[in-house]
């Protein structure tokens, strides 16, 4: 990290990744909004739960994204200003830890819930072949269980 060019390139990569994650958060909500009129005919409660869960997932993703962009700002604005290196390291590691936890909660837990809800709605409605809906019914709980395992250090 001693060479400024390397740091600038890494910051640009993080910014590009942030742009992609922003697009992900927007499309998560867009997917739920597009599916809302279709799946609400089966169960308005489950359809609303799906939309709410997608919104929560997107919010969690954005929180993690903000923490990662804060690390870039911390590096660019304060590291060169002669701030205490130990304090900056602790703050940076804390912000990265926030990103890691939000990655577990958003794409971990919420995706499992979303898969289960959507799989059940599609299974009941017959909008997709049953075998395809079963992927959501089986995959959702597996993703959720995987996130729980990671949460407890497995």
Q: What is each stretch, according to the model?
A:
Residues 1-154:
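Hydrophobic, aromatic-enriched alpha-helical segments typical of multi-pass transmembrane helices
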């Amino acid at each position: 990290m001693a060479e400024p060019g390397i740091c600038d390139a890494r910051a640009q990569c993080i910014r590009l990744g942030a742009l992609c994650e922003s697009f992900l958060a927007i499309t998560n909500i867009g997917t739920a909004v597009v599916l809302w009129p279709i799946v609400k005919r089966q169960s308005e409660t489950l359809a609303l739960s799906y939309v709410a869960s997608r919104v929560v997932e997107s919010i969690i993703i954005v929180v993690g994204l903000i923490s990662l962009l804060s690390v870039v700002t911390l590096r660019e604005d304060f590291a060169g200003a002669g701030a205490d290196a130990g304090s900056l390291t602790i703050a940076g590691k804390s912000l990265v830890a926030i990103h890691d936890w939000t990655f577990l909660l958003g794409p971990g837990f919420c995706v499992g819930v979303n898969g289960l809800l959507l799989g059940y709605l599609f299974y009941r409605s017959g909008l997709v072949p049953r075998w395809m809906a079963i992927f959501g019914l089986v995959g959702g709980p597996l993703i959720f269980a995987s996130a729980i395992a990671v949460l407890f250090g497995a």
